[in-house]
Amino acid sequence: MRLNIGHIKGQELERPMPSAIVRNLERRAAQEAVDAAVAVLDLNFEQLADTLQVDRRTVYRYRKRQTVPTPEVRRRFDMLREIIQLLEEIFAKPEDRHEWMYRSVPLLRGRRPIDLMLKAELEPIVEILAGYQAGAHI
């Protein structure tokens, strides 16, 4: 991440953002993603740990902003945030989002999205939701 420090003769000057600031931003992003997963997807910490492929205690530390996610976990958080955003855009009611997550979906060969999520298989869920958002039949 880079920090814009001004302009000289139309050129933007940048310097690397201090690592402490980056770590704080990453901790906050992880905490917000945990909160969103609990609120929107109704996941508990154990389910979220399975989704992120981390220990349940690590999820607790993310929630308390005590640790920075690894690059791989950040990637999973990114996909999880995308799933949450797409679900909120596609399904207006929380109960409709919940029903979709827990029912068999033909495009997932009859599997339930929650089952894929708990195995950290997030890409197919993102792809299907993005297709729905683009106008594919639900």
Predicted segments — roles?
Residues 1-138:
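Non-transmembrane "mature" sequence context
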